[in-house]
Structures are given as C-alpha cells and as structure tokens.
C-alpha cells in the first residue's frame, strides 16, 4: 500500500528529528471508522510507554512536524490518549493514477518470494475417472496460487501426482475387463466396489475395437491390458480437461516411479537413521507422536507390505531432495487427519515445518434449479468438470471456485453463473472492465485520447467517490501481498467485487463523457484507465479473461 509506506517513511523521518527510533510495537492501520481518516497509528503511545513521557504531548509534536514537512497530508489529528489519525490530501491520491499506469501489468507485483523455489502439487486425482467439479475447485485454486506466487517473486513449479499403483487402479482394470466380458456376451457378476460409470463402458468398447482378440486373454493379462489402456485414456482426458480449464502442470510424477527406483526403501532407511522408527509386532513404525501427531504410524506392516503413508513419505522426501525450498500440497478436506503425520515425517528429516503448507479444499455442491446434484465416482453419478465448463464457461467456473475460502463449503449455482446480470459475480466484475473499455472507445471517437497520463490535469479528481476509488486502487498492492503470504486467492475475488461495485456506483453518478469541461473528461478517463488496469491485473492472476466487449 503506497499510502502506508509513505506514511511510515514520513513518521520515521519525523521521530528521528525528535530523537527517537521506530519502536517494534508501533503499527499503522486503516481505522474502522472512515471519519477518523485514511490511516491511524499508535506510535506516540508506544514511544511514550518506552521512555516514560506523556503520549499526548509527543503525539502533538509528531502531528505538527508531519504537517509542516509534507503537503501530502490534509490533516493529522491527535485522538484519545495519543493516537494519530491521518488524512491524505487529494493531491496524494491523484498520484495513484500515475503510479498505476506507469507500472501497467506489473502493478501489484512484488518480491515477497525473493526467487524462493516452490513446488505446488494440486489436483492429483486418481486416474480412475474423469475430473469432477470438486477437482475443478482444487485446480482453480492451485493454478491461481501458482500465478499469484510467480507475480510476487517466487520461482514456482507445478506438479500432478499420478496415483497409478494402488488398489483403486487395480479396480479400474478389473472394472474395464468385466465390461469387456459383458460386451462380449459373457454373463458376469458385478462387485459393489467396481466402477460402474458409463465412461467405463466407453473405454471397454474402445479397447475391444483396438484389440478385438482381447477377449481371448487370460484374466490376468486381460486385467493388465485393461488397466494400462484405461489409465492412458483417462489420464489423457484429465490432461485435456485441465488444458481447457487453463490449468497447466509442468511435472507429472508417477507413483510407480517410487517403486521402480526403490525410492521407498531408500526413504525408509533414511528415516530409520534418524532413530525415530521402531519395530513392534513384526511391523515397522514411525514415532510421529514426537512431533505432535496423536499416535505413531505404521510404515511397513507385519506381512512386509508397505502402507500408503510410507509411499507419501517417499514422495515428499523426493520433493525436498529435488531442491525445492517450499512445498505446497492442495488436498481434499478428507485429508485433514493426514497433515500432522506427513509434516512429522518431514520434520524428522530436518525440514522446517514452516516450509511445508497443506491447503485443504472443502466440498463443492452443484445446484441445479435449486436442487443439489449428488456425486459418486463409483456409481458413475457425478458432474464432470468438463460438462460444467461447457455449460457456464471457463471464466465463470474459475471465478466461482475462487470466490470463497478454500476450506469453506461452496455451493455452485448453475443458474446464477449463467445469468448475464449484476447478480452473477463474474459478470459483475467482467462487465466493469468491459464498461471501462467501452467508455474509452467512445471517448476516442469524440477526440478524447490520453497519450501521456503525466500531461493530464488530475487536480479535478476531488469528489468523495473518486477519492474512495483511488484509496481502493492503492490497496491492491496490499491485497496481492496478503493473498500470497496467506495462500488465499479469495482475497483477490473479494477485492474485485468491491472494486467493481465502486466503479459501477461511480459511473452511475458521473457519466464520464457528459461533462462540458475537457480537463474533467480527461482526468476521469485517466481514473477509469487506472481502475481498468487493476481489474485486468487481478483477473489475469485468477486466470480469468478481461473482456473488452460484453
């Protein structure tokens, strides 16, 4: 936030002249009551407490010097026992326009990450069926976080973990093989746990067409052929759906790689070297309770088979070994109990838990005509992500998935998202940008063109609504910084809703092109250009287009 940075610089200079240094507990914040000014600080109270003097006296000295030495403040007042309330001058806020337009598409970016190498793993759905809308939410959040962290100075790599070695994959092969038998006229009994979706039938038909003699295979060979064919078909479908959704993974890491390279056994040996494993009843255990887990965890069972937890440890061990400074996992909410144990394992290897973030994605309920659509992959009764995308569009789907905090339940209302009204959040925001573009085109046709914003007289930007818009535009840098720091892309969607609301309200009061004064038209056009640039930058981070026409 430019205003906060500027105020802090001025305060540091002022208190230095008074013989003081910036105290650790001093804060600058936005007052809850806007009548108290743009910013407030407790610096006088903290200084007074540290050196044992009257806070009101020192607050008055700071206020006097601030106003003497800078024209950027229209008022600096002392409130209560020694709080300082600061209101910036219109001239200060007007410069926000120049700042934004000079920065352009980089406005809001920063070097928070300092080129730190980050690996974000997301979606990682079992290749046992098409992606559904729950996966879509994780995809939107993961991809947006990657964009956001790159925008704030991180070196980001994105990864999809292919669960291709577990029981679910075995069931996929068995399900397809059984369908092949059924399609070939053989009577079969269908176990409850097998996959029953129509996509299984389509895969079986495709495999029969490609390999007509497959029905002559033994069950073992038929199941294996079905598994490999089915997994490739489904995985290719997943990749295509993600591409359509504007989601890209740079790395596709196969679980089978861990087995083929003996990475699991190597990881377990490394863990044993930490002294945090033990043998009990023929099984190998990890002392995860040392790091706060509620119980110790089995790594290798008494029958010598490995647990899923052992595979997960090996996978995450490779993440750090590949040179990443920070690991981010985006998982379904059903993984809540998994967090403590996997973090404990990484701590056992000496990794700081602050370098490992796990974001949980809560469920999505699809509403159609006000009724919730039930979803179950096993039964084949689920809403495919691609169907939702085809119905509402990529932009609408992404924006809606990002509208709420990731660990909050989300109702996805199909009818609302398809509406071209102000009740539809994504339409509300995109229309704000399109409206600005339309005004600028009309202005150009009327002979109003801004070639250099520094030549535009911005002193006309003085109304309460205009200054509120500028305050909100100045806040964008803070929104991006905080969204990246807290891994919270919903901060951006909420900000966009607020900014779009201010823009629509402003235009209703001040039809930009209807003023008789050229300088007013040009200054307001510059303001709209700045608003448009911020909306564009924010939507770009979300992976949502900023349409010039609607």
Swiss-Prot record:
Q: List the catalytic activities from the record.
A: tRNA(Arg) + L-arginine + ATP = L-arginyl-tRNA(Arg) + AMP + diphosphate
PROSITE patterns membership: AA_TRNA_LIGASE_I (PS00178)
Q: Name one Pfam family in it.
A: tRNA-synt_1d
Principal place where this protein is found? cytoplasm
Keyword Chloroplast in record: no
Keyword Endoplasmic reticulum set for record: no
Looking at the UniProt record for this protein, which Gene Ontology cellular component terms does it annotate, in alphabetical order? cytoplasm
Top-level lineage group: Bacteria
User: Which CDD domains does this entry report, sorted A to Z?
Assistant: ArgRS_core
Q: Which UniProt keywords apply?
A: Aminoacyl-tRNA synthetase, ATP-binding, Cytoplasm, Ligase, Nucleotide-binding, Protein biosynthesis
Please cite one Gene Ontology biological process associated with this protein: arginyl-tRNA aminoacylation
Q: Where in the cell is it found?
A: Cytoplasm
Which positions form S-S bridges? none
Motif ('HIGH' region) on chain: 125-135
Question: Which top EC class is named for this enzyme in its record?
Answer: ligase
Q: Which InterPro entries match?
A: aa-tRNA-synth_I_CS, Arg-tRNA-ligase, Arg-tRNA-synth_N, Arg-tRNA-synth_N_sf, ArgRS_core, DALR_anticod-bd, Rossmann-like_a/b/a_fold, tRNAsynth_Ia_anticodon-bd
Similarity comment: Belongs to the class-I aminoacyl-tRNA synthetase family.
Subunit comment:
Monomer.
- The name on file for this protein is Arginine--tRNA ligase
């Amino acid at each position: 936030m430019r205003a906060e940075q500027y105020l802090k610089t001025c305060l540091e200079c002022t208190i230095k002249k008074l013989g003081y240094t910036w105290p650790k507990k001093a804060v600058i914040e936005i007052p809850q009551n806007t009548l108290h000014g743009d910013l407030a600080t407790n610096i006088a109270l903290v200084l007074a407490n540290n050196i044992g003097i009257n806070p009101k006296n020192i607050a008055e000295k700071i206020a006097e010097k601030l106003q003497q030495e800078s024209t950027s403040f229209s008022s600096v007042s002392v409130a209560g026992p020694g709080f300082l309330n600061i209101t910036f001058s219109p001239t200060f806020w007007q410069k926000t326009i120049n700042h934004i337009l000079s920065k352009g598409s980089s406005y809001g970016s920063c070097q928070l990450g300092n080129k730190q190498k980050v690996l974000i793993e997301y979606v990682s759905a079992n290749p046992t069926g098409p992606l559904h809308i729950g996966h879509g939410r994780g995809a939107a959040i993961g991809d947006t976080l990657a964009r956001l962290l790159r925008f704030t100075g991180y070196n980001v790599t994105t990864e999809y973990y292919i669960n291709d070695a577990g029981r679910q994959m075995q069931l996929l092969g068995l399900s397809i093989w059984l369908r092949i038998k059924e399609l070939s006229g053989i009577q079969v009994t269908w176990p409850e746990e097998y996959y029953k979706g129509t996509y299984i039938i389509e895969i079986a038909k495709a495999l029969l067409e490609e390999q007509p003699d497959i029905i002559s295979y033994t069950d073992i060979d038929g199941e294996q052929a079905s598994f490999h064919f089915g997994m490739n078909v489904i995985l290719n479908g997943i990749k295509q759906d993600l591409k359509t959704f504007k989601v890209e993974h740079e790395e596709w890491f196969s679980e089978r790689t861990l087995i083929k390279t003996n990475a699991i056994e190597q990881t377990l040996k490394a863990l044993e070297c930490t002294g945090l494993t033990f043998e009990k009843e023929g099984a190998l255990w990890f002392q995860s309770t040392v790091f706060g887990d509620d119980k110790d965890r089995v790594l290798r069972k008494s029958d010598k088979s490995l647990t899923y937890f052992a595979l997960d440890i090996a996978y995450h061990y490779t993440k750090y070994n590949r040179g990443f400074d920070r690991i981010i996992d985006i998982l379904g909410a059903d993984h809540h109990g998994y967090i403590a144990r996997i973090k404990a394992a990484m701590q056992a290897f000496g990794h700081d838990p602050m370098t490992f973030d796990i974001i949980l994605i809560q469920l999505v309920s699809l509403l159609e005509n006000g009724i919730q659509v039930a979803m179950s992959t096993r039964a084949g009764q689920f809403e495919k992500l691609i169907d939702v995308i085809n119905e509402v569009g990529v932009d609408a789907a992404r924006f809606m998935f990002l509208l709420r905090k990731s660990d909050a339940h989300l109702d996805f209302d199909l009818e609302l998202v398809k509406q071209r009204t102000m009740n539809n959040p994504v339409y509300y925001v995109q229309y704000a940008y399109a409206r600005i573009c339309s005004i600028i085109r009309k202005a150009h046709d009327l002979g109003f063109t801004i070639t250099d914003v520094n030549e535009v007289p911005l002193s006309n930007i003085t109304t309460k609504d205009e200054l509120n818009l500028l305050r909100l535009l100045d806040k964008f840098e803070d929104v991006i910084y905080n969204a990246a720091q807290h891994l919270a892309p919903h901060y951006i969607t909420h900000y966009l809703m607020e900014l779009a609301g201010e823009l629509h309200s402003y235009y209703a009061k001040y039809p930009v092109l209807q003023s008789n004064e050229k300088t007013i038209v040009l200054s307001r056009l510059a303001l709209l250009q700045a608003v448009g640039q911020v909306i564009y930058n924010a939507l770009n981070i979300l992976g949502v287009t900023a349409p010039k026409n609607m």
